Amino acid sequence: MSQKLMFLFTLACLSSLPSPFISAQIPAIGNATSPSNICRFAPDPSYCRSVLPNQPGDIYSYGRLSLRRSLSRARRFISMIDAELDRKGKVAAKSTVGALEDCKFLASLTMDYLLSSSQTADSTKTLSLSRAEDVHTFLSAAITNEQTCLEGLKSTASENGLSGDLFNDTKLYGVSLALFSKGWVPRRQRSRPIWQPQARFKKFFGFRNGKLPLKMTERARAVYNTVTRRKLLQSDADAVQVSDIVTVIQNGTGNFTTINAAIAAAPNKTDGSNGYFLIYVTAGLYEEYVEVPKNKRYVMMIGDGINQTVITGNRSVVDGWTTFNSATFILSGPNFIGVNITIRNTAGPTKGQAVALRSGGDLSVFYSCSFEAYQDTLYTHSLRQFYRECDVYGTVDFIFGNAAVVLQNCNLYPRQPRKGQSNEVTAQGRTDPNQNTGTAIHGCTIRPADDLATSNYTVKTYLGRPWKEYSRTVVMQTYIDGFLEPSGWNAWSGDFALSTLYYAEYNNTGPGSDTTNRVTWPGYHVINATDASNFTVTNFLVGEGWIGQTGVPFVGGLIA
């Protein structure tokens, strides 16, 4: 094995655990040391040395400097994108302008993440686990944003010198992430048992009834009871506070007739101390492209049920949209809860990438929802996400992105693709070994959709393929039907990422779960309970607090 390959494999092994477990400390971390010593664990040590001053310092001073330089580069890149849009905005193709607009949007998010991270790092050397996880998540997302921008520009042949800046900016953000993860992220002391069979709020739930324990004013309660035609149960201390409620009813008898109008009415930049802004969307087919922008925080959206409240669109790459902007529903606002809603992209199997939901909303939760499309159905783009008792239908790479995401007790339905295509349930997009990202499929069911089950031609179906170099996906305690290829996983192209990815299975059931004939890649593993517990809600998402406050049921550890 070459020295470079050995180094990459070592990085992959070190990064096979979620962020709190990869904080192997640099010797004498609080003492002055050389850039060469500090940069040993950066993805690109030579680049790291080139951006740090050639004088002794500790990891905190180097980390703060790197974050300040990252912030400066992000500001510069926004100016470059603005100039490019001014130059091309009226003459370039729709897809080119779309890619540039995506980059501008992503760059603004990156500015937010870097500013918050820099302010936190400047204020202290010691962070709580949850605060360290916040910053680790923001820096991971900044790198994801750069990668998404670059992909969009490449796909529309509109790089024009921007790709070099993006490449260097991404490397600088990688230095900031590496130094932060080694300096500020504390070692986690796992105090909870591996086995945690009881779900929070279990007494409120039967399977798939989509009810939340809500607490609201008498006026809001009266509105809720009227629109749902059922009486809201009296709440207790565990109930989720609702600050206000508006209704969306297509016949005009509610507050709004469109979902976007209701979202616009939500307060801006709320801290959630007064509860969630509840949008109740009654049954109907809503043909609109819904967006929850980043300033709309603590929004709760409840529908009348799967296949009752349906949001639908048909944008696709073939029709000139970027993958990033093809989504029927776009979520950027943090602390969002979605319940009892179907989101569809009906572009079809011949239109290429066509997203149903794109989520970049931090600490977002979807419960008892359905996402239906073909290629690239569920774009778990970035930050932290949780899906419980949801259905996902798709074909090629139909759960993809680079969030830290757990899908728990969900139904995943590969469907019939265009002839000649294969199905991949996941295509995880981790590009940096220090990112705290990955996809965990926990306690789910994977079986063919009806059209695939009755297909008149053979379709190969896999658990996933590595979209990016450090792709990370774990399938555990999941039922896998017999239609899965025995090899389990598919390559992206040749031997790309086969040594640096982390794919793992643990204690799955069903005729497709036999690992005897699985791939023999260096990055593939059959893991034990201790390793699997690293990818649970409690350990991977640090989720007991933020998911617990939503009222959505979850299992924090492995299922007994």
Swiss-Prot record:
Substrate binds at residues 323, 353, 465, 467. The record marks 375 as: Transition state stabilizer. It is an enzyme of class 3 (hydrolase). Its EC number is 3.1.1.11. Residues 246-544 are annotated as: Pectinesterase 20. Expressed in flower buds. Pathway: Glycan metabolism; pectin degradation; 2-dehydro-3-deoxy-D-gluconate from pectin: step 1/5. The PMEI region may act as an autoinhibitory domain and prevent untimely PME activity during transport. Acts in the modification of cell walls via demethylesterification of cell wall pectin. This is Probable pectinesterase/pectinesterase inhibitor 20. The lineage of its organism: Eukaryota, Viridiplantae, Streptophyta, Embryophyta, Tracheophyta.
